[in-house]
């Protein structure tokens, strides 16, 4: 459909903008204008168009800083983290997120931060909805929460886990019971436990899969140190 073509074209523009800005040091705005002007010909003449833009101007337009961007490393294949951080810093991204404690110093070495830390818990499918996992989850988060604070970070991801046949009400009660064991420690260290809302179409049977459910859990927890992360 025309919408699909536009979407695919925009995605190609984004990838090529990042690629050529880093490799050729041309401005993103110049690159985008050049690609859009090329229209359908981008598919065969994108490299030539970028080269032409390079000849026209080498002016680097500074970012205004109105939007703070963060990116997940796992989306970008086999880049070494050091190299990936260099690219992110070059194009104005401030954070590389969803990294374990061993990687936090590497990101910070490049003057970046970790907007959403990971390293505690048992993964997406095994979360606070299962009371049988609470002791293990609490022990894991009790270890990592102080590490987050010591690293100067704020947010630590957590998950509801799968629904496993329980009602919304039972899920709220299960998660509330487990998470409230951690809230005093999170408040002490000024760390925010952040539960990710995930679409249960892509993550089958995930419990915290819509805003109403997540917002009610926040109300039940009743602490500024528990919030939601939108996927």
Question: Which sequence ranges carry the predicted segments?
Answer:
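Structural motif corresponding to the early beta-alpha repeats
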Residues: 70, 75, 94-183, 187-192
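Residue-level signal for the nucleotide or nucleotide-sugar donor/cofactor binding architecture
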Residues: 26, 136, 209
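N-terminal export signals
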Residues: 24, 30-52
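C-terminal segment of N-terminal export signals and the immediately downstream linker at the start
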Residues: 18-21, 47-79, 86-87
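N-terminal secretory signal peptides
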Residues: 1-26
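Acidic/histidine-rich catalytic cores of soluble enzymes
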Residues: 85-89, 181-231
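Short linear capping/connector segments at secondary-structure termini
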Residues: 31, 160-164, 196-200
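Alpha-helical elements of Rossmann-like donor-binding domains used by nucleotide-donor carbohydrate transfer enzymes
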Residues: 30, 34, 83, 143, ...
């Amino acid at each position: 459909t025309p919408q699909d073509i536009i979407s695919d074209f925009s995605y190609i523009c984004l990838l090529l903008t990042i690629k050529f800005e880093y490799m050729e040091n041309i401005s993103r705005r110049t690159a985008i204008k050049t690609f859009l002007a090329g229209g359908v010909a981008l598919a065969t003449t994108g490299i030539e168009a970028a080269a032409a833009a390079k000849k026209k101007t080498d002016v680097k337009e500074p970012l205004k800083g109105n939007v703070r961007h963060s990116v997940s490393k796992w989306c970008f294949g086999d880049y070494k983290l050091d190299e990936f951080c260099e690219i992110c810093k070059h194009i104005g991204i401030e954070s590389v997120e969803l990294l374990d404690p061993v990687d936090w110093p590497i990101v910070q070495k490049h003057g970046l931060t970790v907007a959403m830390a990971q390293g505690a818990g048992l993964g997406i499918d095994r979360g606070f909805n299962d009371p049988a996992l609470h002791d293990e989850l609490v022990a894991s988060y009790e270890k990592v929460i102080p590490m987050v604070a010591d690293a100067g970070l704020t947010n630590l991801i957590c998950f509801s886990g799968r629904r496993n046949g329980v009602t919304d009400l039972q899920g709220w009660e299960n998660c509330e019971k487990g998470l409230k064991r951690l809230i005093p420690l999170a408040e002490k260290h000024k760390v925010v436990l952040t539960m990710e809302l995930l679409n249960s179409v892509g993550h089958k049977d995930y419990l915290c899969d819509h805003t109403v459910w997540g917002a009610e859990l926040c109300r039940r927890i009743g602490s500024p140190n528990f919030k939601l992360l939108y996927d």
